[in-house]
Amino acid sequence: MLFKQTFTGFLILALFGCGTDSSQDSTSDNLVQDTKSELVLSEKESVKIKKILTPPVPIKPFKFKQQVKGYTSNFFANPLDGNIFISGSFCELRGNHFHAGMDMRTGGIEGWNVRASADGYVERIKISTRGYGRVLYIRHTNGYTTVYGHLQQFKGAIANYVKERQYKQRKFEIELFPKAGELSLKKGQIIALSGNTGGSGGPHLHFEIRNPSGQSTNPLLHGLMINDKLKPEIKRISIYRRDQNSLHSTGNYPYTTISKWGDQIQKKKPIKLKPGNYSFGVLANDYFTDKKNVLGINYCWLTANDQLVYSYQIHKFNFSQGRYINAHIDPYLKWKEKKIYVRLFKEPFNPLPYYQQKNKGNLTISDGDSVIMRLYIKDYAGMMDSVLWVLHGDKNASELAKPVGGISDEVKQVKNNTRIQFYEWDINVPKKSIYHPFDFKLKIKNVKSGMLSKTLQMHYPYTPLHSYINVSYTVPEKWISYGSKLCAFSMDVSRTYYEGGTLHGNVLKFKTRSLGEYAIGYDELPPTIKPIQVGKSYRFSVKDNLSGVKEFICSIDDKWILAEYEPKTNIISGTIPNWIKPGEYIFKLIVKDNRGNTSKFQRKLIL
């Protein structure tokens, strides 16, 4: 076998601190780092390893090669004034997607000038209460597009263009596609102010550079300069049993995890495994200027006896494939440990093109075999971390732990195009909505507070869905009178989430991309409106605790005026436009939730 080299002794190597950052401590005086970031052994240790691990036929050691050195430099400029400090890196692992760009810090405040990164024209504008919030897309002369997200406000001609169309369409949330050259821009021109709109967790600028094919590329490969002082760091290793029948009924593999600081790595204590096929995973972080800000890893490779097992490198990606992050990581360990482990093997259902592997990322170990494993990670500045561990095949070794499953009333084998009928529930799993077949477990639990139906435990929340599944519930006659107020909810330990649903006769239908607990309830409560300020400028606190705010209308004497809604703060705000002359008016705010419940605020207003 390619990766099987039997030996009776074990080589003790300390392979930490292998980065190019000279400020990092080294744990071995016998190791030095050459200019190509390859490990170099002392003469004494080289003799030892030749005696211990010499294959019958010499095999050339695997050397990692970075596919992309960089794009055109100096074309794109920093869109913010001053130095770049990063709070989110390219292709960082997020909830259910890869992070498409680079998040630039703005010191915890809004209102920084945002400038066009290069000459071009505005090709798309969007305002949404979700996603990127206020966002601009600028097309450039080289065919690339830059994206500026979570903006507080647009500036100049862009602001006027947007407001004019908001009034024309009588909408706050809007998407526009200006004609080529209609809104031309020069490099360095102020286009907006930074903000915290949409799905942002704090003030910053989200910045992307997309190639002519629409793929997001790493801004750091385009010559943007950042201050990167710290090397990446390997935290833990995961080991998976991957024989033909080892996939657990939950859809996960038997596993164990090993700390970088444990004896198996620090003292090279052999890890004993039963004979079979194994794959690996890694928990690792990158940092730029401080370890409080954890970033993602984009270069990684794993070897067994110096031969490639698996490698990946990400420098661009397609948005349509973003949800395949659930195949790139270990969803079970993400749920169990609240940490994100990257799988160092490619599953058959994973179409992402970032990988190079041998034997499907599997390592075959027989009884008595011993293998030296080396794992390397690297950041864009060229700094590295690496670890070494030793595997030993032993037929008497303990089995790896199986993923935990719960008690269920019924178990159904789920494949593509599977229909499950369970009491009043009907679940349809379309083609390509799951990553691989698994035992779908169902259980009926007691009615929870505020719900009508008993709770359906629909498998486990750690099992991801790639696309929507269709769920139906047969509604009892006594609930039909709720009509359009009937809806589905999902629950976790602390919260209830609105899932929507449409009533067709006596069947409520909805879609979901998450598994877990579900129940049927209703929403008859209208939103609450509390005035904070009503005058030339106005602010209202608007809340809806069930289905959520769907739409709102603000008017002066029944004439529509522009207002803005920020769900994170539950604030609707705006300014009376200058074309409203001084006088006495009726100010009105109407807010409707997702089940049609409506509230109205009305007051005389003297301007």
What are these regions (language model features)?
Residues 216-239, 246, 310-312, 394-414, ...:
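Low-complexity, Pro/Ser/Thr- and charge-rich linker/hinge segments at domain boundaries
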Residues 16-17:
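C-terminal motif of bacterial Sec signal peptides marking the signal peptidase cleavage site
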Residues 274-279, 464-470, 532-539:
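Short coil/turn motif common to extracellular beta-sandwich-like domains
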Residues 399-401, 411, 440-487:
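Proteolytic processing hotspots in large secreted/extracellular or virion-associated proteins
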Residues 404-417, 462-463, 477-485, 489-550, ...:
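Proteolytic cleavage junctions
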Residues 29-145, 152-154, 172-181, 186-187, ...:
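Surface-exposed, glycine-biased beta-strand/turn segments
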Residues 186, 227, 242-397, 507, ...:
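Long, low-complexity serine/threonine/glycine- and acidic-rich segments characteristic of extracellular
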Residues 205-225, 390-392, 503-523:
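Short, structured interface segments
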